[in-house]
Amino acid sequence: VLLDGFIRKFVLCPECENPETELLVSTKRSTISQGCKACGYHSPLESNHKLVTFILKNPPNLNPAVQGSSLTEGKRSKRSKRPNGDTNGDTSQVDDQNESLEASVNENSKNGDDDEGHEWQADVSEEAVRARMQDLTEGAKNMTINDDLEKREKDRMDIFYE
């Protein structure tokens, strides 16, 4: 019940009830407003709640680099380091793969294997269209060209209602 109340007051948008809210802390005015990223609704939060007073007394960091980091991230990084200074996982293998990929890309560009000089558009001349129509299978021809195209518009629309 306590968790449901917290979610309803601080996580869900009061307008659209989506959990897309962002709390905006203004220490100068001693207010916290709630802005929904989904519907754009903005409203101030009740200032008599214990959590609101705690947030106002201890505002979050405004440094964007710190904003996404976890509170336990520092503890994890200390635990995951090995005595010789390496972290968990072998990064040298990944570096070798990246270097080989870059080398192959650079080699292809030096050899002229890039797509410069090619035109990537459909030829719309009558001869090219005729050649493409011949390549179509009989079933596809029946779907694209049939006697229904010669009917009046009203008759073609009546096909859907039959």
From Swiss-Prot:
- The reply to whether GTP-binding figures as a keyword in the UniProt entry is yes
Q: Which Pfam families match?
A: eIF-5_eIF-2B (PF01873)
**UniProt keyword annotations, A-Z:** GTP-binding, Initiation factor, Nucleotide-binding, Protein biosynthesis
Where does this protein have compositionally biased stretches of type Polar residues? 85-109
Q: Which GO terms describe its molecular function?
A: GTP binding; translation initiation factor activity
Chain intervals for the UniProt region annotation (Disordered): 59-162
User: Which InterPro entries does this entry report, sorted A to Z?
Assistant: IF2/IF5, Transl_init_fac_IF2/IF5_dom, Transl_init_fac_IF2/IF5_Zn-bd
- List the biased-composition ranges (Basic and acidic residues): 148-162
Recorded superkingdom: Eukaryota
**Function of the protein:** Catalyzes the hydrolysis of GTP bound to the 40S ribosomal initiation complex (40S.mRNA.Met-tRNA[F].eIF-2.GTP) with the subsequent joining of a 60S ribosomal subunit resulting in the release of eIF-2 and the guanine nucleotide. The subsequent joining of a 60S ribosomal subunit results in the formation of a functional 80S initiation complex (80S.mRNA.Met-tRNA[F]).
Name the family.
Belongs to the eIF-2-beta/eIF-5 family.
Protein name, entry field: Eukaryotic translation initiation factor 5
- Organism, by scientific name, is Tribolium castaneum (Red flour beetle)
